[in-house]
């Protein structure tokens, strides 16, 4: 991010240490590179010179002329409502929490510890509930009817087993028929041989004719 907190007239600053630590002031004039003339009419800080080391610049800027009187500074402060805006910032909330923690006793710290444990337990239980709900939404069919799906899977497996057997039998049947056909083919082969044998006696038929002539 671009740095925008520059030292200028009207810039509101937070006093980090010194006699006015924890208060807000507005820069009225710049004396030199180390000091500035500041005024805090609404924070009970009189106009005085203050080193920049004591100040931390904020994002708030007031509109008043150079070296303006306290009256104009107060009017600009109230018009911008700096006090409420500052109280709503994270910076002010952290400072307040740090101060509150520094003032805590042992019993207060014990109560805080017990409260944190209860909070963590509640959060953990809620997270588990949300995780279970997410799982149920992700798999609505599997979660409610696991038994039905198991039975359906068993039935499908049982149905597949005889189907496989039938297909195996159907595959084996043609394999058995093929050798049968081959056997018949082998048996048919001798038939022509027998026919050839029959042709031989047909060729021998002239023998009786010869015997007829002799007769």
UniProtKB/Swiss-Prot annotation:
Example of a GO cellular component annotation carried by this entry: cytosolic large ribosomal subunit
Name of the encoding gene: RPL14
Residues found modified as Phosphoserine: 139
Keywords of the record: Acetylation, Cytoplasm, Isopeptide bond, Phosphoprotein, Repeat, Ribonucleoprotein, Ribosomal protein, Ubl conjugation
Domain of life: Eukaryota
Positions of the UniProt region annotated as 4 X 5 AA tandem repeats of Q-K-A-[PAS]-X: 171-190
Compartments where located: Cytoplasm
Signal peptide: none
N6-succinyllysine modifications at: 85, 204
Region: 2 X 3 AA tandem repeats of K-[GA]-Q, residue numbers: 193-198
GO MF annotations in UniProt: cadherin binding; RNA binding; structural constituent of ribosome
Family to which this protein belongs: Belongs to the eukaryotic ribosomal protein eL14 family.
Quaternary structure (record): Component of the large ribosomal subunit.
Role according to the record: Component of the large ribosomal subunit. The ribosome is a large ribonucleoprotein complex responsible for the synthesis of proteins in the cell.
SUPFAM superfamilies per the UniProt record, alphabetical: Translation proteins SH3-like domain
Database matches in Pfam families: Ribosomal_L14e
Location in chain, cross-link Glycyl lysine isopeptide (Lys-Gly) (interchain with G-Cter in SUMO2): 124
GO biological process: cytoplasmic translation; ribosomal large subunit biogenesis; rRNA processing; translation
Name of this chain's protein: Large ribosomal subunit protein eL14
Modified residues (N6-acetyllysine): 79, 85
């Amino acid at each position: 991010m671009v740095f925008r907190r520059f030292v200028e007239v009207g810039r509101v600053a937070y006093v980090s240490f010194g006699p006015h630590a924890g208060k807000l002031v507005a820069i009225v004039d710049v004396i030199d590179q180390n000091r500035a003339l500041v005024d805090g009419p609404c924070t009970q800080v009189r106009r005085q010179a203050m080193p920049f080391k004591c100040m931390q610049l904020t994002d708030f800027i007031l509109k008043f002329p150079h070296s303006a009187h306290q009256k104009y500074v107060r009017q600009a402060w109230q018009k911008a409502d700096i006090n409420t805006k500052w109280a709503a910032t994270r910076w002010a909330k952290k400072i307040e929490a740090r101060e509150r923690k520094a003032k805590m006793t042992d019993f207060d710290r014990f109560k805080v510890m017990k409260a944190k444990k209860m909070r963590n337990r509640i959060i953990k239980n809620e997270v588990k509930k949300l995780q279970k709900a997410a799982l149920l939404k992700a798999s609505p069919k599997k979660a409610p009817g696991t038994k039905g799906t198991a039975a359906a899977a068993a039935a499908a497996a049982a149905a597949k087993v005889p189907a496989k057997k039938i297909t195996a039998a159907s595959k084996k049947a043609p394999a058995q028929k093929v050798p049968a056909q081959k056997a018949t083919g082998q048996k048919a082969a001798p038939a022509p041989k027998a026919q050839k044998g029959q042709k031989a006696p047909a060729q021998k038929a002239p023998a009786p004719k010869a015997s007829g002539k002799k007769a």
